[in-house]
């Protein structure tokens, strides 16, 4: 069984991005800038934002965090976004989820300039991705990171059966669409399973590549996996664990220890897909910068 080490790949990628940032800085006289907006004081969101800022610094990019109180109105937030849309020093805009209930996520997504939508959530970017115009869009960071893992580990995908478990707008839907594309890392026959799927184990056992993104700890069991399958675990679930100082431990959507005995390759949690998401966010930001300077 081969362990797909997202932590190592993300470190390698960030080193490559750092070199590229230095090259582009010499040509443009400035560096890429990412601005993250966080509304409210969700502890998990604050951790994610700190990690993004740290990664920006490591690659030589500028990072700005705008912290807004939970009572910020939707109009105020949209005004902040519009100002960033017009700022030439900002090449990537990210609004950290979740948002307070009185703010409509779709309105926020629509407000971000597609050319700075480095999360890849704007309908213009999603549409270009579905059409296969990948050089004209930003790809959602988690699916993009999974493609990078498949490429760097030279996992054969052409003509393989890929089963995606989950249909979220952030992972499941874009992942399924990407695996259909005619790329070296994709070109699969794709099945999508979700909460209403009947006989799910029968379908997942057909997968040469199984991608779990359902948000339920240890949902994918040994009995649901074909021997020799490649298993990609997107889930990050907190499970109570009194033996840990934090009081919890992280678990994926896959029962790792048992499924690893069946798989030819598998991603761990933590240290698999998670680190890749931030790395691809930085890659998208660098791409936005390069486009804005015609580099």
Curated annotation (Swiss-Prot):
<dbReference type="GO" id="GO:0004477">
    <property type="term" value="F:methenyltetrahydrofolate cyclohydrolase activity"/>
</dbReference>
<protein>
    <recommendedName>
        <fullName>Bifunctional protein FolD</fullName>
        <ecNumber>1.5.1.5</ecNumber>
        <ecNumber>3.5.4.9</ecNumber>
    </recommendedName>
</protein>
<dbReference type="GO" id="GO:0005829">
    <property type="term" value="C:cytosol"/>
</dbReference>
<dbReference type="InterPro" id="IPR000672">
    <property type="entry name" value="THF_DH/CycHdrlase"/>
</dbReference>
<dbReference type="InterPro" id="IPR020630">
    <property type="entry name" value="THF_DH/CycHdrlase_cat_dom"/>
</dbReference>
<dbReference type="GO" id="GO:0009086">
    <property type="term" value="P:methionine biosynthetic process"/>
</dbReference>
<feature type="binding site">
    <location>
        <begin position="166"/>
        <end position="168"/>
    </location>
    <ligand>
        <name>NADP(+)</name>
    </ligand>
</feature>
<comment type="similarity">
    <text>Belongs to the tetrahydrofolate dehydrogenase/cyclohydrolase family.</text>
</comment>
<comment type="pathway">
    <text>One-carbon metabolism; tetrahydrofolate interconversion.</text>
</comment>
<keyword id="KW-0028">Amino-acid biosynthesis</keyword>
<keyword id="KW-0378">Hydrolase</keyword>
<feature type="binding site">
    <location>
        <position position="236"/>
    </location>
    <ligand>
        <name>NADP(+)</name>
    </ligand>
</feature>
<dbReference type="Pfam" id="PF02882">
    <property type="entry name" value="THF_DHG_CYH_C"/>
</dbReference>
<keyword id="KW-0511">Multifunctional enzyme</keyword>
<dbReference type="GO" id="GO:0035999">
    <property type="term" value="P:tetrahydrofolate interconversion"/>
</dbReference>
<keyword id="KW-0521">NADP</keyword>
<dbReference type="GO" id="GO:0004488">
    <property type="term" value="F:methylenetetrahydrofolate dehydrogenase (NADP+) activity"/>
</dbReference>
<keyword id="KW-0560">Oxidoreductase</keyword>
<dbReference type="InterPro" id="IPR036291">
    <property type="entry name" value="NAD(P)-bd_dom_sf"/>
</dbReference>
<keyword id="KW-0486">Methionine biosynthesis</keyword>
<keyword id="KW-0658">Purine biosynthesis</keyword>
<comment type="function">
    <text>Catalyzes the oxidation of 5,10-methylenetetrahydrofolate to 5,10-methenyltetrahydrofolate and then the hydrolysis of 5,10-methenyltetrahydrofolate to 10-formyltetrahydrofolate.</text>
</comment>
<dbReference type="GO" id="GO:0000105">
    <property type="term" value="P:L-histidine biosynthetic process"/>
</dbReference>
<keyword id="KW-0554">One-carbon metabolism</keyword>
<dbReference type="InterPro" id="IPR020631">
    <property type="entry name" value="THF_DH/CycHdrlase_NAD-bd_dom"/>
</dbReference>
<comment type="subunit">
    <text>Homodimer.</text>
</comment>
<dbReference type="Pfam" id="PF00763">
    <property type="entry name" value="THF_DHG_CYH"/>
</dbReference>
<dbReference type="InterPro" id="IPR020867">
    <property type="entry name" value="THF_DH/CycHdrlase_CS"/>
</dbReference>
<keyword id="KW-0368">Histidine biosynthesis</keyword>
<feature type="binding site">
    <location>
        <position position="195"/>
    </location>
    <ligand>
        <name>NADP(+)</name>
    </ligand>
</feature>
<dbReference type="InterPro" id="IPR046346">
    <property type="entry name" value="Aminoacid_DH-like_N_sf"/>
</dbReference>
<dbReference type="GO" id="GO:0006164">
    <property type="term" value="P:purine nucleotide biosynthetic process"/>
</dbReference>
């Amino acid at each position: 069984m081969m362990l797909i080490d997202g932590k190592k790949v993300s470190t390698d990628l960030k080193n490559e991005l750092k070199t590229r940032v230095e090259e582009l800085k010499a040509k443009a006289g400035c560096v890429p800038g990412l601005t993250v907006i966080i509304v409210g004081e969700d502890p998990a969101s604050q951790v994610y934002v700190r990690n993004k800022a740290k990664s920006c610094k490591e690659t030589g990019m500028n990072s700005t965090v705008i912290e807004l109180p939970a009572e910020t109105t939707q109009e105020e937030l949209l005004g902040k976004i519009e100002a960033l849309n017009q700022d030439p020093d900002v090449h990537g805009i990210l609004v950290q989820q979740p948002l307070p209930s009185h703010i409509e996520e779709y309105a926020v997504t629509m407000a971000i300039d597609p050319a700075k939508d480095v999360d890849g959530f704007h309908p213009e970017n999603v549409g270009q991705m579905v059409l296969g115009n990948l050089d004209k869009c930003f790809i959602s960071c988690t699916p993009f990171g999974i493609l990078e893992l498949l490429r760097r580990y030279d996992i054969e995908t052409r003509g393989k059966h890929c089963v995606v478990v989950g249909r979220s707008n952030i992972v499941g839907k874009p992942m399924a669409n990407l695996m259909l594309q005619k790329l070296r890392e994709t070109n699969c026959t794709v099945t999508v399973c979700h909460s209403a799927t009947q006989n799910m184990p029968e379908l997942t056992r057909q997968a040469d590549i199984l991608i779990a993104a359902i948000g339920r700890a240890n949902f994918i069991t040994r009995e649901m996996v074909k021997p020799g399958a490649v298993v990609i675990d997107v889930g990050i679930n907190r499970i109570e664990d009194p033996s840990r100082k934090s009081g919890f431990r992280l678990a994926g959507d896959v029962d790792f220890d048992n499924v690893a005995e069946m798989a030819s390759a598998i991603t761990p949690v933590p240290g698999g897909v998670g680190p890749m998401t931030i790395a691809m966010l930085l890659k998208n930001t660098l791409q936005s910068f390069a486009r804005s300077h015609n580099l």
